[in-house]
Swiss-Prot record:
<dbReference type="GO" id="GO:0016887">
    <property type="term" value="F:ATP hydrolysis activity"/>
</dbReference>
<feature type="binding site">
    <location>
        <position position="70"/>
    </location>
    <ligand>
        <name>Mg(2+)</name>
    </ligand>
</feature>
<keyword id="KW-0234">DNA repair</keyword>
<dbReference type="GO" id="GO:0006310">
    <property type="term" value="P:DNA recombination"/>
</dbReference>
<feature type="binding site">
    <location>
        <position position="69"/>
    </location>
    <ligand>
        <name>ATP</name>
    </ligand>
</feature>
<feature type="region of interest" description="Large ATPase domain (RuvB-L)">
    <location>
        <begin position="1"/>
        <end position="185"/>
    </location>
</feature>
<keyword id="KW-0227">DNA damage</keyword>
<keyword id="KW-0238">DNA-binding</keyword>
<protein>
    <recommendedName>
        <fullName>Holliday junction branch migration complex subunit RuvB</fullName>
        <ecNumber>3.6.4.-</ecNumber>
    </recommendedName>
</protein>
<keyword id="KW-0378">Hydrolase</keyword>
<dbReference type="InterPro" id="IPR041445">
    <property type="entry name" value="AAA_lid_4"/>
</dbReference>
<feature type="binding site">
    <location>
        <position position="25"/>
    </location>
    <ligand>
        <name>ATP</name>
    </ligand>
</feature>
<feature type="binding site">
    <location>
        <position position="314"/>
    </location>
    <ligand>
        <name>DNA</name>
    </ligand>
</feature>
<keyword id="KW-0233">DNA recombination</keyword>
<keyword id="KW-0067">ATP-binding</keyword>
<feature type="binding site">
    <location>
        <begin position="132"/>
        <end position="134"/>
    </location>
    <ligand>
        <name>ATP</name>
    </ligand>
</feature>
<dbReference type="GO" id="GO:0006281">
    <property type="term" value="P:DNA repair"/>
</dbReference>
Length: 336
C-alpha cells in the first residue's frame, strides 16, 4: 500500500473526512472562518446579484487542497437560495456526461465542478457556450448528414475548484467572472475551527489544546479536524474525555506529528537528504529511491509544506535542505 494513502497529514480528502466533515461545514459566509478577502468579495458579489435578481457570475476557486473550496461552493448556493449540483472533472468523461448534468439544472442552480483542471479539452468546448450564452450545442448524426442542434439552458452559476489554476486553458479561465484564491489559515483561525469542531462533536477541549492542534495542522482545516478526531480518541480511551494539553501532546507524539506539523515521512525525506547527500543539492529522482515514493508524489504531496516553512529549497542543481531544518533536528550545519 502506498504511504500517501495512510498519511494522517495529507491535505487530500479521505473517506472518513467526507463522512464526518459534512456536519462541520458552515452554511453561511458569516459562519465561515478565515479567507477574509475571498469571503468579503463574495458577500458583495452575491448581494449585488440578488439585488438585480440575476444569477451570480461564474466563480473559480483555486488554491491548495483542504482549504475550504467545496465548502465555499455550497455556501454560495445557500446564500443565493438555490440548489447545488456537484461533480468533478474526472467524473465527466464524455461530452454527453456534461450535457446530462447541464440539462438537469434548474434556473439559478449552482453547478460545482471540483478538479475542473482535469476536464478534457473536448468537454471544455461544450462548456464554453453553456457558460457564455446558457445554451448547449449538440451534434446529431454522423458524417455528411450530421447537424447541430442548439438547446437553451436555464441561467446557472458554474463554480469551479482547482489546485492547479495554471493547468486550466486560457479560454476556460477567461470565462469566469469571479476568481478567488484560497489561502493557508493562521494558527488563530485554525484554533477557532478546532474549537467549533469540538463543539459539534460535543467534546470538551482546552483552549491551549486547540492551539496546539492548530500549530501542527499545516495551515489546513482538513488536517486540523482530522488531528482533533484522533486526539479525541486518545482523550476518551486514555483520559476522561476532555481534550487537554497533556492528552494532545501525548497523542500527537504517538501519532508522530511534531511541533511544526512534520510527520515521519517528512523526517525521512529531510534526514535522507542530510545524511546521504550532505544536505544537497540532490536530484529529485535520487531522493525518491530512499523513501520508496515516485518523484511526482514527492513534488506534489510532500514538498509543498517543506517549501512553505523554508526547510527545503528547489534549485537548478536539485533539492537543498536549509539551515532551518538542521536547527529543527538539532543538527550541526555542515561547513562548505
Amino acid at each position: 500500500m502506498s504511504i500517501i494513502v495512510e498519511r494522517l497529514l495529507s491535505r487530500e480528502s479521505a473517506y472518513g473526512d467526507a463522512v464526518e466533515d459534512f456536519p462541520l461545514r458552515p452554511q453561511t459566509l458569516r459562519q465561515y472562518i478565515g479567507q477574509n478577502k475571498a469571503k468579503h468579495n463574495l458577500e458583495v458579489f452575491i448581494e449585488a446579484a440578488k439585488m438585480r435578481e440575476e444569477t451570480l457570475d461564474h466563480v473559480l476557486l483555486y488554491g491548495p487542497p483542504g482549504l475550504g473550496k467545496t465548502t465555499l461552493a455550497n455556501i454560495i448556493a445557500n446564500e443565493m437560495g438555490v440548489n447545488v449540483k456537484t461533480t468533478s472533472g474526472p467524473a465527466i468523461g464524455r461530452p454527453g456526461d456534461l450535457a446530462a448534468v447541464l440539462t438537469a439544472l434548474q434556473p439559478g442552480d449552482v453547478l460545482f465542478i471540483d478538479e475542473i483542471h482535469r476536464l478534457h479539452r473536448s468537454i471544455e468546448e461544450v462548456l464554453y457556450p453553456a457558460m457564455e450564452d446558457f445554451c448547449l450545442d449538440i451534434v446529431i448524426g454522423k458524417g455528411p448528414s450530421a447537424r447541430s442542434v442548439r438547446l437553451d439552458l436555464p441561467p446557472f452559476t458554474l463554480v469551479g475548484a482547482t489546485t492547479r489554476a495554471g493547468a486550466l486553458s486560457a479560454p476556460l479561465r477567461d470565462r469566469f467572472g469571479v476568481l478567488s484564491r484560497v489561502e493557508y489559515y493562521t494558527v488563530d483561525q485554525l484554533s477557532a475551527i478546532v474549537e467549533r469542531t469540538a463543539e459539534v462533536f460535543e467534546v470538551e477541549i482546552d483552549s491551549l489544546a486547540a492551539l496546539e492542534i492548530a500549530r501542527r495542522a499545516r495551515g489546513t482545516p482538513r488536517i486540523a479536524n482530522r488531528l482533533l478526531r484522533r486526539v479525541r480518541d486518545f482523550a476518551q480511551v486514555r483520559g476522561n474525555g476532555t481534550v487537554t494539553m497533556e492528552i494532545t501532546q501525548m497523542a500527537l507524539e504517538l501519532l508522530q506529528v511534531d511541533k511544526l506539523g512534520l510527520d515521519h515521512i517528512d523526517h525521512k525525506l529531510l534526514l535522507g537528504i542530510i545524511e546521504k547527500f550532505r544536505g544537497g543539492p540532490v536530484g529529485l529522482e535520487t531522493v525518491s529511491a530512499p523513501i520508496g515514493e515516485e518523484s511526482h508524489t514527492i513534488e506534489d504531496v510532500y514538498e509543498p509544506y517543506l517549501l512553505q516553512i523554508g526547510f527545503l529549497q528547489r534549485t537548478p542543481r536539485g533539492r537543498i535542505v536549509t539551515p532551518l531544518a538542521y536547527e529543527h533536528f538539532g543538527m550541526e550545519i555542515p561547513k562548505v
